[in-house]
Amino acid sequence: MEELKHCPSTLKEGFSTYSPEACRKLFGGKQVSHILDFDSPNNNSADSTDYAEHIGRISLSGVQPKGALVLRDGSLRKPKEGERGEYILKPAPESYALLERKYCPANEHLTMQMAAQAYGIETAANALCFFRDGEAAYITKRFDVAPDGSKYPQEDFASLAGLTKANGGTNYKYGVLSYEDCADIIRRYVRAAQVDLLRFFRVVLFNYITLNDDAHLKNFSLIDRGNGDYRLAPAYDLINTSLHLRTPQIFALEKGLFKEGMRMTDTHTVDRTDFEEFGRRIGLPDRMVKREVDTFAKVSLLALGLIERSFLSEELKKSYRQSYQYRCFTLK
């Protein structure tokens, strides 16, 4: 593979591997290679097939496989039997239904970095890494694993709402609740609810301007990091889905922002007034709502720089940039 010109985590210029800042956030300060010692699961080698079918498989959400990695002796490797994965590995999906599927890891990485760097949203630490055959994969550090290896209690919003396929149907992650209902979940379970309602509001706004229509109930969760209080977990699974889906939606949740649903037509989709009403409904002060909508209505030069330095193709960079700028404009 070609030598890198940007840190594959922070996207800072002048680095051919992970920068010191990235190593601190992801690896406890250890210098770690960005190249894995095995091939992509999309490669037909026996080694990659064994990994995909037998080692470290966590789940399959939609069409995107997830695997596990551990950090040992300065390298990321597959976990042995009985080892708890410290990192989640997401290679490019194999589904031919997706457009430009090999760039899914770069898309998720860019979107997560935009959230953290340009908008100050707390996110799971993340980066790109590369298989031995050169294919990129997305890696994120598990925030539900304590330093001693134990697991912090964590519940996604579908579980907290008591929704399953049995009582909510096969579309239960998307078709039952609204984002206003999600705010009620925060209010019910989080002691410092007002703080997390603001954090939630900002993530919903960010998902809108970055065209993430896969922010379903399992992509929000509450976590207790050992002090007995649940709080909104760091943002995860942020991605501009419009780059890969043939018929993208505006919101993942079919009801949209409001409990009664949203009537969207060819002449009215979503604008600033909808988010202002949403902010008020979930209990945020008007001045705070205005401040946040103003923030997300303004195109971030830092975000544009991240798009330009990302590992997307030039064509996808252009599409991402244009769609992001347009969504910001709709909030003015």
Please provide the spans of the model-predicted regions.
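Conserved kinase catalytic-core segment
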Residues: 102-119, 175-246
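A residue-level signal for conserved active-site and pocket-lining positions in enzyme catalytic cores
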Residues: 69, 115, 157, 214, ...
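Regulatory N- and C-terminal appendages and interdomain linkers associated
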Residues: 1-47, 53, 188, 230-232, ...
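Small/polar glycine-rich anion-binding or flexible loop at a beta-alpha turn
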Residues: 131, 291-301
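Catalytic-core segments of enzymes that bind and process phosphorylated/nucleotide-bearing substrates
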Residues: 158-185, 225-286
